[in-house]
Amino acid sequence: LTRLADIDTGPLRLHRGICIVTPATPSSDAPSQIGLVPLQNELEKVQVELDSLKAEINFLRRRDETLNFYMNRLDEELRLAARLQQDFLPRTLPQVGPLRFHTLFRPAGYVSGDLYDVFRLDESHVGFYMADAVGHGMPAALLTMFIKNALVTKQISAEGYRLLDPGEALARLNDKLVDQNLTQATFATAVYGSINAKTLVCRFARAGHPFPLLMRGDGSVLNLQSDGGLLGIFPNDVYEDRQIQLRAGDRLFIYTDGIEVAFADDHALNTQQWRVELEHRREMPVERVLLELSENLDRETGSLAPKDDLSIVVAEVRPDA
């Protein structure tokens, strides 16, 4: 048997750490035989490496199983949160006098940072609001749930009740958000308003939210502007009350900025394309308009992974009012 370092001549073959030496001619110094030389040290090193590799593979397999377990549990919790958030949305929409309400809701994930509601304030008034919490996912969804519970629309006393002006309602909501002293940046935009079903006077206030869009029955389109900053930033902020007279055939669109992103043209967050989409469907029933908008979004590239939540509430004054 000859170690590799002692070989001077002769054919040499290496196979998996085994040195096989075949002397060309027998000599008096070396016996005439074929030597199989296990490189014991090398084999031991290889075995150690194999054992280490097996241990690492087993560790990774166990970690993968643990990750899958927690991912499955997270998926179940998010699905539960999505069902709970759906319970915060109105199951039915009020129909009061000539007023009809329609909605479109497309969350970007399991849960949404968008929230809306339409509800009776009293026999004559219908209230509506839409809120959009910063960000996406669970933190944004939890913030919208807080907003729903914290928004006060009427003040009740022993003598009766008083409907809060929209600006006052948003100011109270803002102060409640500020008082939370949350460590993370938590703020939201919102629109709150009410419509008198008898007089068709719409009163509203806005907190950093996209302007409501009013499509008149005569074909004109108006952005309903009012001043007011984001909710949850500055205490004692003021939100401007505005009002407008609605007429038969009018459609009032309240929406989150996800609709602007979804229909953005070459200029991001440009509402022009969004308005064009609506104007092309002026003669359609509102239900059909929202259905076609949703179908168009489904055909867009990246529709399976939308960039933002998308919500629309439409207040329609029936043409025969």
Named regions from a protein language model:
Residues L1-A30, R91, G249, E287-K307, ...:
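Non-catalytic regulatory/interaction regions at protein termini and inter-domain linkers
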Residues I7-T9, R16, A30, S52, ...:
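Short linear motifs in intrinsically disordered/low-complexity regions
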Residues H15-I20, Y129-A131, Y255:
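PAS-family sensory domains
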Residues P26-E76:
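Amphipathic alpha-helical coiled-coil "transmission" helices that mediate dimerization
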Residues Q40, E44-Q47, L143, I147, ...:
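Interdomain signal-transducing alpha-helices
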Residues S52, F69-Y70, A158, L278, ...:
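Residue-level detector of alpha-helix boundaries and kinks
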Residues E56-R251, G302-A321:
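… and, occasionally, acidic/histidine-rich disordered N-termini of signaling adaptors
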Residues Q245-I254, I259-A321:
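C-terminal catalytic subdomain
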